[in-house]
Amino acid sequence: MSKTSRIILWCVLIVVLAMCIVLYAAAKRPAADTTYRDAGKTYAESLQPGDETPVITGGDFTITAHTFENMCTQNRASGMTETVAAQYTLARYIVTRSLYYQAVTDGYAAADAAVQQDIDDTRAAAQTADNREAYEQFIAGTGMTEDAYWASMFETRKLMLTLENYTQAQKAAFLAAGHAPDETDAWHDFCYTLTKAAVDAQNITLAAPYSWTLTRENYNDTGTWPELTQSTGTPG
């Protein structure tokens, strides 16, 4: 796994699949540790109403100050400076949302039934895991019922599964064009071209004082597709 992928897996765990923090950390923390409850509390706080001022505005989506700052907080907690955390958060939201809506437009949206099955499978695995106690502490920390927690994950999992569908289709197109599976640089060039087109189509505007532009130079450092779409239990 690349350095970029490892950073991604750490930075978006709570927002994308908060439970994974619990499952990963459980074997490494004493039972009395409040890590799991704290993680649950942080996740629940991210769902509460907050500052609705737009920070990122695209043709099909808006990221509010509340949502943006929640992600920045997680990035800073992973060791990023304030400036780097903000830039990384801009990159993540701009790229993932732009690609998601492009995927939907192109007909790759994950079916609701498939999303629900994915959630049901993940929930079943969590309930039978060796570290179930940690999972229970996390749920307790959210202040939500299990049903409510998993329901709250629906849109996030729909986004990730849609991106996985899109990635698989584009990988097939890449190979059909005569490329070999191990042509990593060519694959990244291919992905960058599609990503840039998707981002440009959104006509992104950012609130002051933020600025960020996708370039080929920063593409592989921003945690962007295709790394973010790998379905390994902790979506990129």
Where are these regions (language model features)?
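Generic detector of bulky aromatic hydrophobic side chains
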Residues: 4-6, 96, 117-127, 166, ...
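Short, low-structural-confidence N-terminal segments
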Residues: 1-82, 192-236
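N-terminal targeting/tethering segments
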Residues: 38-147
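Solvent-exposed, amphipathic alpha-helical "stalk/arm" or coiled-coil-like segments used as scaffolds
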Residues: 82-109, 136-216, 221
